[in-house]
UniProtKB/Swiss-Prot annotation:
GO BP terms, alphabetized: intracellular manganese ion homeostasis
Gene field: mntR
Species the sequence originates in: Bacillus velezensis (strain DSM 23117 / BGSC 10A6 / LMG 26770 / FZB42) (Bacillus amyloliquefaciens subsp. plantarum)
Family: Belongs to the DtxR/MntR family.
Subunit and interaction comment: Homodimer.
Gene Ontology terms, MF aspect: DNA binding; DNA-binding transcription factor activity; manganese ion binding; protein dimerization activity
Protein name: HTH-type transcriptional regulator MntR
GO cellular component, one term: cytoplasm
Positions that bind Mn(2+) 1: 8, 99, 102-103
Residues that hold Mn(2+) 2 according to the record: 11, 77, 99, 102
Principal subcellular localization: cytoplasm
SUPFAM superfamilies to which the protein is assigned, alphabetical: Iron-dependent repressor protein, dimerization domain (SSF47979), Winged helix' DNA-binding domain (SSF46785)
Activity modulation: DNA binding is strongly activated by Mn(2+).
Length: 142
């Protein structure tokens, strides 16, 4: 079972490896705005729990278990961003809102949000209808 903090690290490591082909402690620390010693401590825990393989001074690689979870965590994050965009959340608020909610939703809830996103993506008129409803509730009496 992963904690929210472990998930943040796995997600970031997965994204760095996808983007650069590798993830160093310094890159992870910079991306998460934490001290490198905190990264080393967490990486050692993730190694012990078999999410990655870490060799001091040599770098790290995600295990198949780590890759699977990393991919799912990135999907969750991107899906929630997409959902918040569809429902009209201000762009500058989306990242922090996703960070605030992503660890508190069950995978069942994530899957249902995915269904809802798909529903809106399948037919552009549904998005327009939602915007129309939002306009009415924001400006009652118009």
């Amino acid at each position: 079972m992963t904690t929210p903090s472990m998930e943040d690290y796995i997600e970031q490591i997965y994204m760095l490896i996808e983007e650069k082909g590798y993830a160093r402690v310094s890159d992870i620390a910079e991306a998460l705005a934490v001290h490198p010693s905190s990264v080393t401590k967490m990486v050692q825990k993730l190694d012990k729990d078999e999410y990655l393989i870490y060799e001091k001074y040599r770098g790290l690689v995600l295990t198949s278990k780590g890759k699977k979870i990393g991919k799912r965590l990135v999907y969750r994050h991107e899906l929630l961003e997409q959902f918040l965009r569809i429902i009209g959340v201000d762009e500058e608020k989306i990242y922090n809102d996703v960070e605030g909610i992503e660890h508190h939703l069950s995978w069942n809830s994530i899957d249902r949000i995915g269904d809802l996103v798909q529903y809106f993506e399948d037919d552009e008129s549904r998005k327009k209808e939602l915007k129309s409803v939002q306009k009415k509730t924001e400006n009652p009496g118009e």
